């Protein structure tokens, strides 16, 4: 019961103006990402050995579920909203960029380091117990792959002040610019065979979705449902 008591205390200390719906969406999206990645990482015994597998490959009928559990846009929209709130607060306090960035990154990186250290210990124990390297590699990937989006999000946090200034000055045109860059990247990738350029779409697409968080903060998109429609449109236009 202590955890619920602690949660109640934290809720009581939360400022009235804080958007709790944003906190709810962040928690739900992260939980779905983690659980979803764990569920698709399947393993089975073959010839007496544990063999790594992938649910979407071994059971193709489950692939349609990925359309239902597309929650990453929600996470990045919420990230944009939260970064806007944080940047506004920093501006009121006269906080420098380095101080602001250190605070934001500490909240992201500290828990990740704890996870990495804990899993390193688990992997070491598995090795000492004679577990096959392939199994250690598979379980490590299954345990840590849900953190992939943090690498992208950390880059967005670093770029957030510049992206927010672009939003304040150009509004939805800034979002359109990122979508256009994503489309041009795809054209270069498929038409000109510039494969190395394809990786940049991790930034352009999610920067565009992140801008929607700024729009939400400014009340420019109306209801959250409309926000998700915008997000879906961005994802479709920039595959």
Which residues are covered by each model-predicted region?
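Aromatic-anchored segments of alpha-helical transmembrane domains
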Residues: 34-38, 178-192, 232-239
């Amino acid at each position: 019961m202590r955890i619920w008591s602690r949660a109640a205390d934290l809720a009581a200390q939360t400022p009235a103006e804080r958007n709790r719906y944003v906190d709810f969406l962040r928690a739900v999206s992260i939980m779905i990402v983690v659980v979803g990645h764990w569920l698709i990482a399947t393993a089975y015994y073959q010839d007496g050995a544990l063999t790594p597998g992938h649910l979407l490959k071994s059971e193709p009928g489950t692939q349609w579920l990925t359309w239902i559990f597309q929650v990453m846009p929600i996470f990045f929209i919420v990230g944009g909203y939260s970064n806007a709130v944080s940047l506004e607060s920093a501006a009121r306090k006269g906080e420098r960029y380095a101080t602001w960035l250190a605070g934001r990154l500490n909240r992201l990186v500290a828990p990740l380091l704890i996870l990495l250290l804990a899993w390193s210990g688990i992997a070491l124990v598995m090795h000492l117990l004679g577990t096959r390297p392939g199994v250690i590699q598979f379980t490590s990937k299954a345990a840590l792959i849900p953190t992939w989006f943090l690498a992208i999000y950390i880059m967005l946090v670093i770029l957030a002040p510049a992206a927010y200034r672009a939003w304040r000055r150009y509004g939805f045109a800034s979002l359109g610019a990122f979508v256009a860059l994503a489309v041009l990247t795809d054209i270069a990738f498929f038409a000109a065979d510039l494969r190395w350029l394809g990786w940049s779409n991790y930034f352009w697409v999610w920067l565009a979705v992140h801008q929607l968080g700024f729009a939400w903060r400014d009340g420019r998109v109306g209801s959250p449902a409309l926000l998700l429609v915008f997000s879906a449109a961005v994802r479709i236009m920039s595959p």
